[in-house]
Amino acid sequence: MTPHILSRELQRALRWQCQQVFGGTHHTHWFEGLLTKLRRVDSVQASRSVFGNSTIARHAAHVLFCLHVMNTDPDRPPESVDWGQSWGDVQIDDETWADLLHLLTGEAERLETLVGTLQTGPLSTDRLLLIINQLTHAAYHAGAIAQILKYETYLNQDVAEGVQEAKVLI
């Protein structure tokens, strides 16, 4: 692949994107980053399967796995990774949820550091695409988690309204 030139502007944009994807927009509330969203979730909520298959904890563990693979060996061919194990069963209690969040925060910081320490100058297309892919991937999972949380809120409201209606009938 032909190397591209990493400008300071592109480097700054990628670092800003890291901050947005994981932290969100702190000055407005239109987007909560992945870590900001996960810090509002407790271990019970993270373990609950709302749609009957995936949980918030599984999404978080999957993103952690993917970031760790990239941060540890960014030149590793994607086909050499057993991506299926990233969706393994995740048993969460308060301690393991706190550990998962701590590890995920560390990997997000490693990605931002990687972007920040890239030297301006030649950058392989593969490396650039890998960074952009990780940011897009984490943003996708932030959105998936947001949908799980909204659906869970909807279910809780629907159940609460149903209980209120039942009380009226009694």
Describe the residue ranges of each PLM region:
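Short coil/turn linker and secondary-structure boundary residues
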Residues: 41, 54, 92-95
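Amphipathic alpha-helical packing segments from all-alpha helical-bundle domains
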Residues: 27-37, 104-107
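Short, contiguous alpha-helical
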Residues: 1-28, 35, 43-86, 121-170
